[in-house]
C-alpha cells in the first residue's frame, strides 16, 4: 500500500483558519521534499475535535467547511488527506474528499462506524484505544475486514497509566505488526497528560524524540506527528504538538533510523 517508504502522517491537530492550514501544509511539504524517495507524507487535520475536555474548547470548523479546506489542501499540494470521523454519516461524507479515514481511539470498537468507514473503500487508520491491549485490536481489524476492505493502518498512541497519564509499551509495535498491516506510532498524543490541566490536556513534548526513535527502532512503519508553527497558540493540543522547527530537525533522524532498521530486516530475511 505504501511500498517500503516510511509513512509520515503530519499536520495540525485541528483545522483553524484556512490560511493557517494552508501555511502549515506548505511548510511540511517544503520540509519533506528532500526525502520523498523515502517518506510517504499524508496530511492530517480534524474538522471536529468531538472529545475536547471542556465544553468551551474550540472544536473546529465543522464537517462541511472542514472538508472544503481539506479539499483545497489536497488540490494545492497534491497530498493525500487523512481526517478522523465520528459517525457513519460523517464517514461517507469525508470519503468524498479524504483518502484515509481515521477511527479515533475512543471509538475504535464502534462496529457501525468501523463498517461504514470501511465500506467507503478508503484506507482506514484505526487508532488503538488507550484502554485496549494490542491483542484486542484484532476485533476492530476483523470488523473492517468483514466488508472486504483490507486497506488498514494501525496506530499506537499509548495506554492509560493511572490518572492523567499515558505510557508507551514498545511491545505493542511487534504485536500489532503481526496482524499484517502497517503500524504507525503517534508520537504526539503518546506524550499527552489527558485532562491533566483540568479544562484541557497537558503534554510532555520533551519525550517525543525519545519515543519516536524507540518506536522506529522497534519496527514501526511510520509516525503520526501533529505539528504547528507555534504550538503555544494552537487551538487544540497545544501542550503536545511539535513545532515545525523541531519537526524539521527530527525528520532526518527519523528517516535514517527507519532506513537502518529496514536494511537489517531485509538482511535477516
Curated annotation (Swiss-Prot):
Q: What is its EC number?
A: 2.5.1.55
Recorded catalytic reaction(s): these are: D-arabinose 5-phosphate + phosphoenolpyruvate + H2O = 3-deoxy-alpha-D-manno-2-octulosonate-8-phosphate + phosphate
**InterPro entries noted in UniProt:** Aldolase_TIM (IPR013785), DAHP1/KDSA (IPR006218), KDO8P_synthase (IPR006269)
Q: What are this entry's molecular-function GO terms? A: 3-deoxy-8-phosphooctulonate synthase activity
The entry's family comment says: Belongs to the KdsA family.
Reply yes or no: does the keyword Cell inner membrane apply: no
Gene Ontology biological-process entries: keto-3-deoxy-D-manno-octulosonic acid biosynthetic process
For this UniProt entry, what is the primary localization, expressed as one broad class? cytoplasm
Known Pfam families for this protein?
A: DAHP_synth_1
Q: What is this protein called?
A: 2-dehydro-3-deoxyphosphooctonate aldolase
Q: Where is the signal peptide?
A: none
Q: Where in the cell is it found?
A: Cytoplasm
One term under GO cellular component: cytoplasm
Q: What is the lineage of its organism?
A: Bacteria, Pseudomonadati, Chlamydiota, Chlamydiia, Chlamydiales
Q: What is the name of the gene encoding this protein? A: kdsA
Pathway(s) the chain acts in: Carbohydrate biosynthesis; 3-deoxy-D-manno-octulosonate biosynthesis; 3-deoxy-D-manno-octulosonate from D-ribulose 5-phosphate: step 2/3; Bacterial outer membrane biogenesis; lipopolysaccharide biosynthesis
Q: Which UniProt keywords apply?
A: Cytoplasm, Lipopolysaccharide biosynthesis, Transferase
